[in-house]
C-alpha cells in the first residue's frame, strides 16, 4: 500500500492548472489556491472542520480541473475559440460536466456530489443548469463566490478602493448571482486588510496551515485512479501528446514489474510516469504544438518543462523519490541531458528506466504529424542511444524483451 499526501498533490495540480489559466484567460498564477483559501476562510462561518474542510479545499483547488479537456474538445469542432467568452457564458456547463466526472474517482472522505458540476450556478436560477441556491450544494456555492471574487480581484487595481468596490459588487449581486448566506459569510470573515493580503503570497502559507494534510493509504486501483486523473489533465494540454502520460505510466510500471521490483515501487513508477510531463502545463502551446523547428529560445523554454515538473512536485510532502523519477526523464548518462545535467553516477535505476520508457513511448505513439514507429525500430534507436552513452544499455535490452512480448 502506498501512502500519499493527496492534498499536497492536489495543490501541485492546481499550480499546473493555474499556468493554463494564466496563459489562456489572463488569470494570474495561484488562482486555484486563492479560491481554496477564500473558500476555507468562508468555511469558518459554518464551523466546517476536519474531513469536510479538506474536501472543500480539494474541490476548490480542482474546480477548473477540466479546463484543458474542455479546450481540447472545443478545438476538435473549431480551430479557433474565444476562451474568455466561451468559459464565462453559454459553454460554461461543459467544463463543469467534465470536471464533475473527472473527480468521481478521487479519494474524498465526504460526499462532494455536484460540487464541481454546480460551481457556476447563480442563486436566482439563471446559471448554466438553472439551479436555485437551495438546490446547490453549499460547497459549490462557496467555491462559486470565491472564484468570482478572485477573478474580479485580478481585474482591478489592488488599492484602497478595491475593498469598497468588492463590497458594493457583492451587495449589488446578493440574491441574484450569490445567495445571501455566502455573501454574509465572506463579509463576516474578511476585512479590508485580509482582503488586501490576497494580492501577496502570504495567503498560501495560511492555506496549508489551515487544511488537514493527513496522508492517505492507496491500494493499486486507487493509485491508478489518482494517477490517471492527473495524467488526463496533462495530456489534454496538447493534441500532440494525447495519452502520452498514460502510456508512460503503463509502460514504466510494466517494466518495473518485469524487472522484479516490489508492488510499492511498481505503483510509484506508475504515478511518476503519469506526472512526468506535468511541467508542460507551464509551457505555451505555441511551443508545444509548433510544426516547425523550434528556435534556440523556444527549445530552451521547452526544456524547462522537466524543471517545472520538479518544482511542481516539490510541493508534495515526502514525494522526493517519485518527483525525481518523474523530473529526471530527460537526463542523460553522459551529463548532457536537461534540465539538471545529471551524470550516470547521479542517476539511479528507476530514473534511468523512466528516461528509456519516455523515449520508447514518444517514438511508438501516433501523433498528428507522424505515425508511430514499430517496436523493433524503436528498440534499435534505443540501442543506438545506449551506445552513445545517452541511456542505460541494460535497460534498453530489457525493454526489447519486456515490451516485445505478445507482439
Give the role of each language-model region.
Residues 2-407:
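Histidine- and acidic-residue-rich, metal-dependent catalytic cores
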Amino acid at each position: 500500500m502506498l501512502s500519499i499526501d493527496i492534498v499536497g498533490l492536489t495543490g501541485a495540480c492546481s499550480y499546473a492548472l493555474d499556468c493554463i489559466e494564466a496563459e489562456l484567460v489572463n488569470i494570474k498564477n495561484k488562482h486555484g489556491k486563492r479560491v481554496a483559501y477564500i473558500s476555507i476562510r468562508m468555511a469558518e462561518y459554518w464551523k466546517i472542520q476536519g474531513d469536510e474542510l479538506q474536501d472543500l479545499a480539494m474541490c476548490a483547488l480542482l474546480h477548473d480541473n477540466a479546463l484543458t479537456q474542455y479546450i481540447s474538445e472545443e478545438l476538435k469542432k473549431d480551430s479557433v475559440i474565444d476562451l474568455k467568452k466561451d468559459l464565462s457564458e453559454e459553454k460554461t456547463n461543459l467544463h463543469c460536466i467534465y470536471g464533475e466526472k473527472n473527480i468521481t474517482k478521487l479519494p474524498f472522505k465526504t460526499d462532494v456530489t455536484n460540487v464541481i458540476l454546480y460551481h457556476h450556478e447563480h442563486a436566482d436560477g439563471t446559471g448554466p443548469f438553472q439551479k436555485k441556491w437551495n438546490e446547490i450544494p453549499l460547497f459549490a456555492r462557496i467555491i462559486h463566490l470565491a472564484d468570482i471574487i478572485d477573478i474580479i480581484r485580478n481585474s482591478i487595481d489592488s488599492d484602497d478602493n478595491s475593498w469598497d468596490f468588492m463590497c458594493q459588487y457583492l451587495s449589488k449581486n446578493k440574491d441574484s448571482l450569490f445567495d445571501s448566506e455566502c455573501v454574509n459569510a465572506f463579509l463576516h470573515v474578511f476585512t479590508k486588510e485580509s482582503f488586501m493580503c490576497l494580492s501577496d503570497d502570504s495567503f498560501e502559507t495560511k492555506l496549508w496551515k489551515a487544511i488537514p494534510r493527513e496522508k492517505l493509504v492507496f491500494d493499486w486501483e486507487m493509485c491508478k485512479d489518482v494517477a490517471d486523473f492527473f495524467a488526463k489533465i496533462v495530456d489534454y494540454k496538447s493534441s500532440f501528446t494525447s495519452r502520452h502520460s498514460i502510456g508512460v505510466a503503463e509502460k514504466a510500471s510494466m517494466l518495473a514489474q518485469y524487472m522484479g521490483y516490489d508492488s510499492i515501487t511498481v505503483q510509484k513508477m506508475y504515478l511518476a510516469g503519469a506526472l512526468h510531463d506535468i511541467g508542460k502545463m507551464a509551457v505555451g502551446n505555441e511551443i508545444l504544438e509548433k510544426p516547425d523547428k523550434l528556435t534556440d529560445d523556444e527549445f530552451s523554454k521547452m526544456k524547462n518543462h522537466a524543471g517545472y515538473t520538479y518544482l511542481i512536485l516539490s510541493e508534495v510532502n515526502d514525494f522526493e523519490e517519485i518527483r525525481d523519477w518523474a523530473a529526471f526523464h530527460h537526463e542523460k548518462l553522459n551529463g548532457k541531458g536537461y534540465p539538471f545535467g545529471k551524470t550516470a553516477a547521479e542517476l539511479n535505476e528507476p530514473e534511468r528506466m523512466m528516461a528509456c520508457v519516455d523515449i520508447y513511448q514518444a517514438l511508438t505513439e501516433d501523433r498528428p504529424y507522424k505515425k508511430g514507429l514499430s517496436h523493433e525500430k524503436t528498440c534499435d534507436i534505443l540501442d543506438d542511444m545506449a551506445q552513445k552513452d545517452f541511456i542505460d544499455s541494460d535497460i534498453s535490452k530489457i525493454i526489447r524483451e519486456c515490451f516485445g512480448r505478445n507482439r
